[in-house]
A protein has these predicted regions:
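Trafficking entry modules
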Residues: 2-3, 9-13, 256-318
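Dynamic helix-loop-helix/coil hinge segments at AAA+ ATPase domain boundaries and subdomain interfaces
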Residues: 3, 10-29, 98
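Conserved NTP-binding/hydrolysis module of P-loop NTPases
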Residues: 11-13, 72-73, 83-102
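Pre-Walker A adenine-sensing motif
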Residues: 28-39
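Walker A/P-loop nucleotide-binding motif
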Residues: 42-62
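Conserved catalytic segments around the Walker B and adjacent sensor/switch elements
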Residues: 46, 69-80
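Mid-core helix/loop region of P-loop NTP-binding domains shared across ATPases and GTPases
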Residues: 84-85, 100-143, 152-155, 194-198, ...
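Helix-loop-helix "sensor" segment of P-loop NTPases
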Residues: 98, 118-121, 161, 169-234, ...
Length: 318
């Protein structure tokens, strides 16, 4: 609707995760490097957590794009954690292209085991990627741990990537999952963007969408207002900016003003969300906290050869 008016070739603030729009902050680069390194080096478990709207699913899409470039990699992508253990196994097998219908749990495990052993004997990489992993029950998480028991003296046959909200960290801290937690090789955390990153994020998306003067569409004051109301969460930034462009188009303005941002924030009741946060309620978006546990991502990236290999593969996203 507003694309022609603002001389754009595509929607710059679509909510659908699109890897071509990835804004490579240091945190996102490190998280993507940790994911790719963990999978390609057969580290076993890799965990990434972050609040709602910090770009976790987009990060996974970028990882899957990288993995598709490698003919020796096969992955199953699970995005529904609200499954029974048997349904979870059926989903995994089906995504790997294996027969799953009508089989009981024992038969499913045998089929998957044979698949992993066969691929392992050929030095191939097999990956289980779980989005929204905070929804997984303790039973399923334990099932996943048991799947990783399949290993040779030299290698792990199944690589597992768990991505979810901070509740996943809390689950992994439970006594019943202590064995799984001990197997986590790499962890990364996605935090909201700071003010400078929010500005860069908005301008990059506008440039990718065809704007020749990205800084002309949103004033500095408007971008500051976007950051204040979104608190740096990319999903909220997209929502605010999308509706701000629609409002500017409707008013026949050539630039988004701070007043428009304030109107959008009121319409979406973002001030109410902020009030819930400041009162400490757990129903709103809480301020991210540091993750403790497995080795820090930065320590992994200090290895020269490995780091070079990873960043070469990641260039399309920078």
């Amino acid at each position: 609707m507003y694309k022609a008016y603002f001389n754009l070739t595509r929607n710059p603030f679509e909510l659908t995760p699109d890897p071509s729009f990835l804004f490579p902050t240091n945190r996102h680069n490190e998280a993507l490097a940790a994911l790719y390194y963990g999978v390609r080096r057969h580290k076993g478990f890799v965990v990434v957590t972050g609040e709602i709207g910090t770009g976790k699913t987009l990060l996974l899409r970028c990882l899957l794009r990288l993995l598709k470039q490698s003919p020796d990699v096969a992955y199953a992508y699970v995005f529904n954690g609200l499954l029974s253990p048997t349904e979870f196994l059926q989903y995994i097998l089906a995504d790997f292209g294996l027969a799953a219908s009508g089989k009981n749990k024992g038969e499913l495990l045998l089929e998957l085991s044979n698949f992993l052993i066969s691929r392992g004997s050929k030095k191939q990489t097999t990956v289980l990627v779980v989005d929204e992993a905070h929804h997984l029950s303790a039973d399923i998480l334990e099932e996943v741990r048991l799947l990783t028991n399949l290993e040779t003296t030299e290698d792990k046959l199944l690589q597992v990537v768990l991505v979810g909200q901070p509740e996943l960290d809390e689950k992994l801290d439970s006594v019943g999952l202590r064995q799984l937690k001990q197997r986590i090789a790499l962890r990364a955390r996605l935090d909201p963007l700071d003010g400078a990153e929010t500005k860069g994020y908005i301008e990059r998306r506008l440039q990718i969408a065809g704007s020749s003067q990205a800084d002309a569409l949103f004033s500095e004051q408007a971008i500051a207002a976007v950051h204040r109301h979104s608190r740096g969460f990319p999903r909220l930034i997209n929502t605010i900016c999308e509706n701000a462009l629609i409002a500017a188009y409707g008013r026949r303005l050539q630039r988004v003003t701070p007043g428009i941002i304030e109107d959008v924030a009121k319409e979406f009741r973002l001030d109410v969300i902020h009030e819930v946060e400041t009162t400490g309620s757990h129903n709103g978006i809480v301020i991210p906290r540091a993750t403790k546990g497995a080795p820090d991502v930065s320590s992994v990236l200090r290895r020269p050869v490995t780091r070079k290999q990873i960043w070469v593969r990641m260039r399309p996203f920078q």
